């Protein structure tokens, strides 16, 4: 049993025995003792004063005496203005370390048949361009959130919805037909998603040229600049051709459908390479080309049930004014669907495929209103998780030189970013890696991959997802400070210490004796290790990968300070050496498990 649980149970018993009243567990408030006071944990007595009918100091004294006598975890206590500072017994610390040591998955809850099923949607790419920096943040958040939810005892299904239809897809298709000359990814020596992205940019270039000429013509005919611009954007031959192609696609034109399938397959192959490089994946992928018709059918069912209204122009709307919102378009007057319709269709397919208890959408904060509306609509349509769906909303990510726009071809490409991070990691870690005995070029490359990706992932995930962030590649690959490489290097350092101990024929016991020597820094490290279970649980409640990232940094920082102050292999006594090796071993274990929740690998040496 954890120290906090022992003390909480004993404190509840103390209140009942001393004051004749049972109080709820939430009344026992424990916190870490301030560094300027003696003790390890502090019990706040103020919530108990109505029960004790005594002054805070007297209440603290009563409970302190009871705990010292009746709770093995408490060795001593002192009272400061109603705060009961508890000194934890030596045996409790070693017992706690033994519990942590015995559990390879310490801090995580097991998944059982009865566990709730959580589905997490992330990535959601368009098939007209490669993945970019914004997708990187999305994918890393989604993957990490899935690991965190599973570590909290949930069954998790990772899912992706691919936006594979619509006018933007037709733009790339039309550009390929006009200017592609039959080019393929193989002929171009390019990933398919990059090739299709080039044609999307090419369409935009020619479209702007057409608009510019038409706008000039309309202005000469007497229109204002704004009127001329708007008309040009609707009347440009290219956009009309793209709309005609979309109509043909929706009417299942075999030639257009064949082209669409071929080009989309090129893109999917490219996406798969990027996902593999990032270390993310999915259990189930949905495609909007399959879900939008399901959504239309679901909306029409809702219309029949009186949930929605049809206006005079034949469009279908949801009236949300009773929720303090406006009316929301669900079907256009020509019967075509909008994004909301597609999301309803996707929800219907998922609901039929899996008995979902909770649905989490990892989507940027520009869609906050969309998901507020979707939640209401799904609830009205009878999805049990609709009202409580979670929109895991995150902010924009930028590089120091500004925002990204894929139409202009200035997008920060995910593949290029990953490749450059690995190259930079290899350069910056060269001095450290070259000192390793018997290191091969293959091992050097693998260490560079682990460190480069670790730097990228950690830098992005350590930031509160709700905030906009600036990703600085140079700052991320630093072996000091709050970075992935700093944590990875500390892990590798501990593994090196443990290998040296093994080479010296030092065998660690499965558990320490109650009287194993422990100084205050060692107790603090054991407490920090114990905090991992709290960090995991809180990250599950808050949907917060940054909570795990910052815990890993705090643990690493605390261990490095300890390692600076105390020798491990050259400790004064054999008992101290064994204790410190046991602590170091478990710090490495928790670092590895914590970083795994972020999707980050740690190298055994570097």
Show where each model-derived region lies.
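Flexible, low-complexity linker/hinge segments
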Residues: 101-113
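Short, charged, solvent-exposed linker or helix-capping segments at domain edges/interfaces
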Residues: 95-100
């Amino acid at each position: 049993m954890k120290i906090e649980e022992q003390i909480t149970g004993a404190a509840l018993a103390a209140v009942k025995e001393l004051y004749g009243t049972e109080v709820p567990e939430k009344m026992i408030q424990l916190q870490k003792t301030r560094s300027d006071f003696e003790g390890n944990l502090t019990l706040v007595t103020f919530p108990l004063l109505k029960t004790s009918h005594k002054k805070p100091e007297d209440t603290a004294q009563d409970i302190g005496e009871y705990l010292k006598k009746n709770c093995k975890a408490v060795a001593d206590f002192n009272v400061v203005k109603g705060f009961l500072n508890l000194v934890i017994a030596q045996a409790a610390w070693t017992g706690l370390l033994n519990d942590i040591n015995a559990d390879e998955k310490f801090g995580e809850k097991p998944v059982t048949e009865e566990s709730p099923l959580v589905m997490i949607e992330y990535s959601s790419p368009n098939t007209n361009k490669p993945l970019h920096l914004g997708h990187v943040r999305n994918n890393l958040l989604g993957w990490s959130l899935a690991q965190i939810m599973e570590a909290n005892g949930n069954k998790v299904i990772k899912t992706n919805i691919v936006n594979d239809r619509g006018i933007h897809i037709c733009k790339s298709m039309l550009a390929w037909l006009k200017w592609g000359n039959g080019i393929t990814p193989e002929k171009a020596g390019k990933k398919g998603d990059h090739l299709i992205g080039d044609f999307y940019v090419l369409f935009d270039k020619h479209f702007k040229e057409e608009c510019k000429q038409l706008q000039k013509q309309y202005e000469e005919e007497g229109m204002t600049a704004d009127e001329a611009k708007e008309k040009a954007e609707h009347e440009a031959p290219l956009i009309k051709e793209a709309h005609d192609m979309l109509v043909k696609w929706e009417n299942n034109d075999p030639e257009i459908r064949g082209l669409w399938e071929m080009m989309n397959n090129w893109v999917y192959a490219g996406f798969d390479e990027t996902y593999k490089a990032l270390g993310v994946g999915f259990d189930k992928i949905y495609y909007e080309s399959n879900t939008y018709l399901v959504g239309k059918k679901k909306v029409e069912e809702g219309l029949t049930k009186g949930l929605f209204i049809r206006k005079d122009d034949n469009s279908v709307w949801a009236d949300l004014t009773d929720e303090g919102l406006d009316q929301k378009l669900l079907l256009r007057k020509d019967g075509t669907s909008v994004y909301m319709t597609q999301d309803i269709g996707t929800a219907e397919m998922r609901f039929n495929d899996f008995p979902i208890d909770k649905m989490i959408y990892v989507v940027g904060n520009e869609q906050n209103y969309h998901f507020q509306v979707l939640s209401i609509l799904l609830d009205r349509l009878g999805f049990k998780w609709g009202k409580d769906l979670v929109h895991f909303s995150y902010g924009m990510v930028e590089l120091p030189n500004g925002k990204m726009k894929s139409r202009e071809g200035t997008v920060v490409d995910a593949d290029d970013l990953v490749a450059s991070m690995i190259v930079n990691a290899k350069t910056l870690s060269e001095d450290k890696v070259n000192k390793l005995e018997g290191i091969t070029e293959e091992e050097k490359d693998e260490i560079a991959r682990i460190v480069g990706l670790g730097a990228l992932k950690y830098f992005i995930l350590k930031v509160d997802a709700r905030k906009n962030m600036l990703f600085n590649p140079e700052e991320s690959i630093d072996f000091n400070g709050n970075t992935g490489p700093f944590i990875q290097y500390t892990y590798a350092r501990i593994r090196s210490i443990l290998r040296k101990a093994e080479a010296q024929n030092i065998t660690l016991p499965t558990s320490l004796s109650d009287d194993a020597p422990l100084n205050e820094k060692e107790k603090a490290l054991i407490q920090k290790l114990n905090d991992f279970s709290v960090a995991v649980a809180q990250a599950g409640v808050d949907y917060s990968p940054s909570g795990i990232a910052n815990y890993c940094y705090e643990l690493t920082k605390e261990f490095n300070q300890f390692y600076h102050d105390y020798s491990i292999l050259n400790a004064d006594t054999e008992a101290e050496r064994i204790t410190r090796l046991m602590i170091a071993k478990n710090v490495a274990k928790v670092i590895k498990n914590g970083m795994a929740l972020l999707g980050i690998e740690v190298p055994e040496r570097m």
